């Protein structure tokens, strides 16, 4: 029996994205399921599903991440591994941090 395109989408694996600080309130959860080949694709997918979170992550509806938002992949800042365009897989751990200030 051939597999339809719809059936093949059921096998796409998702990964867990952890949210911190005020981003949790925007998404109304501390953890989201996301899918995509790159960090950027995942961020756009979760932003499409959670509009308030998308507004907090991206400036004026653009694809530019707001300053001071930190994306960590397996404990490393995404800026150290090539920004938002490196490939990620289901075994990678992604965490998103809002700006943090202290004093």
Each model region followed by its residue ranges:
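Ubiquitin-like/PB1-type beta-grasp interaction modules and other compact soluble beta-rich domains
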Residues: 2-102
């Amino acid at each position: 029996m051939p597999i339809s395109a719809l059936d093949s989408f059921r096998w796409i694996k998702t990964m867990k994205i952890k949210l911190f600080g005020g981003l949790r309130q925007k998404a109304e959860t501390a953890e989201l399921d996301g899918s995509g080949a790159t960090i950027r694709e995942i961020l756009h997918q979760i932003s499409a599903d959670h509009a308030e979170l998308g507004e907090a992550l991206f400036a004026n509806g653009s694809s530019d991440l707001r300053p001071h938002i930190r994306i960590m992949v397996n404990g490393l800042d995404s800026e150290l591994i090539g920004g938002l365009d490196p490939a990620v897989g289901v075994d990678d751990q992604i965490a998103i941090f809002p700006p943090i200030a202290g004093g």
